[in-house]
Swiss-Prot record:
This is Solute carrier family 35 member F5. Keywords: Membrane, Phosphoprotein, Transmembrane, Transmembrane helix, Transport. Residues 253-317 form the EamA domain. Belongs to the SLC35F solute transporter family. InterPro entries: EamA_dom. It comes from the Eukaryota. Its main location: membrane. Putative solute transporter. It is a multi-pass membrane protein.
Length: 524
């Protein structure tokens, strides 16, 4: 009996193996080892898992958007509580130390504390010491577009090259030569059980798919690591953040200075109500300079803002005659601050579309630095013009300013900007309306202020306009007012339906004979 030959080369017809029937651990098919096939299959399964996860992430984007909206609303509610407490503390400070410019300058300069992140936070130091964006950005330049395509594109076009057919030379393989030396005594060839093609088809991927070929050789954890690197690379550098902070430093300072001037002239409740008019300016600016779908202009949003403005007018009319002059000046400062706040949030959201691209603490840190370096000459200007005499506060007032600056400015502004990124610029500005009931309660309890019925009549529509706009943005810019207007217009201007008369059937002709079609169906 002739022993079965040891077959370790290519799968030539007639070759047998000494391994068990299912022991394919070292088998070779058409010049490809089974280990290579198994490794390629495992890699392909890993990449398929990546594609499936990307599809799942794209399908769950609606759920994540709702979570972002809910988190943003909670953050804005917390900011409202902090702002009301900060406003009451500021109002108390102004009774003993009425220096709005000094208070604003001191609070804004405290943003410099965020720059301590360059000492504590290692990624910030890497951006300055090693040029963090250099090598990874060049190495994974095309990968960002690849991951974006995985989540947005629904079909991958197979743009392979034209097929090239090359004959397979089984006898030229080194394994075949080794086989011929070991089993040269065999003279009777066995009947072929597996027939292989003598021609192999070769297709080449285009250069645009080179990244996919590279990723197919990477494990799933490695792909996830590179994806996290891409997110880090997508962040703005320290230089870019500093440039943005330099521009918004002046706008932010003017907005806060206007708010502080208003607090020094009138009650906290009136200031907060008038400051909520920033929703009108935000709606107009966001319609002109939209940053996302949540900033789209709708008729329902316009009516909600008009409702808020109507309430503001009633609140302004509720002021007493004794303090009418100061209330008017405070109202003007409040409206100016509302306008600057709208410019600030709309422009920064247009400049930075996602919150993960901007390091918010770094942004505010540079804002405080530029404020400290560039705006100190304002003390001399206001002192010599007589608008605000420079005077250093006492220890109690200084302690109140420091506490108010750390919590009411440094922390609250960070949370507010984060909440605006999670929701929309309009919701972020209209969130100021929620300070109305809290400030009313605080003024009535702490300062014993009595408000007229006009004040409450105006506070209610301003308060509810925030919830109206939130619902409209939550339901994908739902515009019920426009829908109602269209239905009313269609009801009024509807046309009578054209009724067919018997003579119309004579003028109708079927292009396809229904009788012939039915006969063909019956025949089949």
């Amino acid at each position: 009996m002739v022993p079965p030959r040891l077959h370790r080369g290519a799968g030539r017809p007639g070759g047998l193996s000494s391994l068990p029937p299912f022991g394919l651990g070292s088998a070779r098919f058409a010049g490809i080892a089974f280990e290579d096939l198994r490794e390629a299959l495992a890699t392909r399964l890993q990449m398929v898992y990546v594609f499936i996860m990307n599809r799942v992430n794209s399908q769950s984007s609606g759920f994540s958007q709702r979570r972002r909206m809910a988190l943003g609303i909670v953050i804005l509610l917390l900011v409202d509580v902090i702002w009301v407490a900060s406003s009451e503390l500021t109002s108390y400070v102004f009774t003993q130390y009425n220096k709005p410019f000094f208070s604003t300058f001191a609070k804004t300069s405290m943003f410099v504390l965020y720059l301590l992140g360059f000492i504590i936070w290692k990624p910030w130091r890497q951006q300055c010491t090693r040029g963090f964006r250099g090598k990874p950005a060049a190495f994974f330049a095309d990968a960002e577009g690849y991951f974006a395509a995985c989540t947005t594109d629904t079909s991958m076009s197979s743009s392979l090259s034209e097929p090239l057919y090359v004959p397979v030379k089984f006898h030229d393989l080194p394994s075949e030569k080794l086989e011929s030396t070991n089993i040269g005594t065999e003279k009777t060839p066995k009947k072929s059980r597996v027939r292989f093609s003598n021609i192999m088809e070769i297709r080449q991927l285009p250069s645009s798919h080179a990244l996919e070929a590279k990723l197919s050789r990477m494990s799933y954890p490695t792909v996830k690591d590179q994806e996290s690197i891409l997110k880090t690379v997508g962040k703005l550098t320290a230089t870019q953040v500093a440039k943005i902070s330099f521009f918004f430093c002046f706008v932010w300072f003017l907005a806060n200075l206007s708010y502080q001037e208003a607090l020094s002239d009138t009650q906290v409740a009136i200031v907060n109500i008038l400051s909520s008019t920033s929703g009108l300016f935000t709606l107009i600016l966001a319609a002109v300079f939209p940053s996302n779908s949540g900033d789209r202009f709708t008729l329902s949003k316009l009516l909600a803002v008009i409702l808020s403005i109507g309430g503001v007018v009633l609140v302004n009319l509720s002021g007493s005659e004794k303090s009418a002059g100061r209330d008017t000046i405070g109202s003007i400062w409040s409206l100016a601050g509302a306008m600057f706040y709208a410019v600030y949030i709309v422009m920064i959201k247009r400049k930075v579309d996602r919150e993960d691209k901007l390091d918010i603490p770094m942004f505010f840190g540079f804002v405080g630095l530029f404020n400290l370096l560039l705006l100190w000459p304002g003390f001399f200007l206001l002192h010599y013009t007589g608008f605000e005499d420079f005077e250093f506060p006492n220890k109690v007032v200084l302690l109140c300013i420091i506490i108010n600056g750390l919590i009411g400015t440094v922390l609250s502004e960070f949370l507010w900007l984060w909440g605006c990124f999670l929701t929309s610029s309009l919701i972020g500005t209209l969130a100021l309306s929620l300070t109305i009931p809290l400030s009313i309660i605080a003024d009535m309890c702490m300062q014993k202020v009595q408000f007229s019925w006009l004040f409450f009549a105006g506070a209610i529509p301003v308060f509810f306009s925030f919830f109206i706009v939130t619902l409209l943005c939550h339901y994908n810019n739902w515009d019920p007012v426009m829908v109602g207007v269209r239905r009313v217009f269609a009801f009024i201007c509807r046309k009578h339906r054209i009724q067919r008369v018997p003579e119309d059937s004579e003028q109708c002709e079927s292009l396809i004979s229904m009788h012939s079609v039915s006969q063909e169906d019956g025949a089949t």
